[in-house]
Amino acid sequence: MSVDVTNETQWVIDPKVFSDLGIWVLDQMRVSTQSDLTIMFVDPNPIAELHMRWMNLEGPTDVMSFPMDELRPGDGKTVMEGVLGDIVICPWVAAQQAAAAGHSTMQEMLLLTIHGILHLLGYDHVTPEQERQMFGLQRQLLLTFFALRHDANVQATLPAGTPDALALYDAAHGAGRDLDSK
């Protein structure tokens, strides 16, 4: 199983943590060990462009998933192999959401990674029942992953003096964006 992690931001992010999480979640969901996944961390501008292009929604968002092969979770046996797809995460939006939720940016980005994987596997949260199922599963996966890890306190940070890319985005594109209205 291959999980490639790319960081195109100034955030200091340990790619191994996200690779380990991706491999573990795919194993738990019984996706073939021959499957590939890419996780990419980007700044607000690139994810805002993707958000507009693919969802016709303005502004940066927290996570977007781009499926490749239509792989689905296994039912006790491993599913066929293939390229699962790409997950794009914006640490700036994750940090804002984490502050509002009262947990760390790292915890939020790990949650968003699981959320993105579940979308790639066909889960959605359009209806209340779908939301209950998907959010329950992502919470269960995240808490179990934390329980199994000995380094659960690893953090994602910004070097001192790094400009706030989300504030710069808002200044260039107009403030007043409401993250809760996604």
UniProtKB/Swiss-Prot annotation:
Gene Ontology biological process terms in this record: rRNA processing
Pfam families given in the database record: YbeY
Cofactor binding annotation: Binds 1 zinc ion.
Alphabetized UniProt keyword annotations: Cytoplasm, Endonuclease, Hydrolase, Metal-binding, Nuclease, Ribosome biogenesis, rRNA processing, Zinc
Listed GO CC annotations: cytoplasm
InterPro entries with a match to the protein in the record: MetalPrtase_cat_dom_sf_prd (IPR023091), YbeY (IPR002036), YbeY_CS (IPR020549)
Cofactors: Zn(2+)
Binding-site positions, Zn(2+): 115, 119, 125
Location of this chain's protein in the cell: Cytoplasm
Domain of life: Bacteria
MF term (GO), any: RNA endonuclease activity
EC number: 3.1.-.-
Functional note: Single strand-specific metallo-endoribonuclease involved in late-stage 70S ribosome quality control and in maturation of the 3' terminus of the 16S rRNA.
Homology family: Belongs to the endoribonuclease YbeY family.
Record-given protein name: Endoribonuclease YbeY
Organism: Bifidobacterium longum subsp. infantis (strain ATCC 15697 / DSM 20088 / JCM 1222 / NCTC 11817 / S12)
Name of encoding gene: ybeY
